[in-house]
Regions:
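ATP-dependent NMP and nucleoside kinases share a basic, alpha-helical "lid"
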Residues: 1-55, 73-76
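Alpha-helical elements of Rossmann-like donor-binding domains used by nucleotide-donor carbohydrate transfer enzymes
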Residues: 4, 68, 94-98
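Alpha-helical initiation/capping and key positions within long helical/coiled-coil segments
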Residues: 39, 61, 68, 87-90
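An amphipathic alpha-helix signature
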Residues: 44-48, 59, 89-92
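NTP-dependent small-molecule kinase module
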Residues: 56, 74-129
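Conserved catalytic-core segment of NTP-binding enzymes
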Residues: 59-78
């Protein structure tokens, strides 16, 4: 799927991946301009409730998942943004807002914008004369 992801990016499309911390850090090494958003639970209690609520894990697995999630939360500083996953619709909207802001980040397009105006400047100077 790596090729498919880069094909989408080459076409100018946003790609959203739901991945574990280890995968995110691997992507960050290969594609440093990627934007990383940490989706946090509203609270640790809610995190534990959600894990238990699935009803698919043993008590030992629940404890392991909870501890693993907590360890990942401690690495929040490796991400660019965070959101609290309270209400799905609100969380989705926050992610879309982050994507929109990133599209207007000067550091992403500084050279392209300057090149665009550089190409146009001579025509404008001619018109003014």
């Amino acid at each position: 799927p790596k090729k498919a992801i880069f094909d989408e990016l080459d076409m100018g499309r946003d790609v959203i991946l739901e991945i574990e911390m280890q995968g995110a850090m691997q992507i960050k090494e290969v594609y440093p301009q990627a934007v990383f958003i940490f989706v946090l639970p509203p609270s640790l209690q809610e995190l534990k409730n959600r894990i238990i609520g699935r009803g698919t894990e043993t008590e030992e697995q629940i404890e392991k998942r909870f501890n693993s999630a907590y360890d990942e939360i401690k690495l929040l500083g490796d991400y660019d943004y965070f959101i609290f996953n309270n209400i799905v619709e609100k969380s989705s909207e926050e992610i879309l807002n982050i994507l929109e802001v990133e599209k207007n980040k000067v550091s992403r397009y500084k050279k392209d914008i300057l090149d665009m105006f550089e190409k146009e400047i001579e025509n404008v100077k001619t018109i003014i004369k």
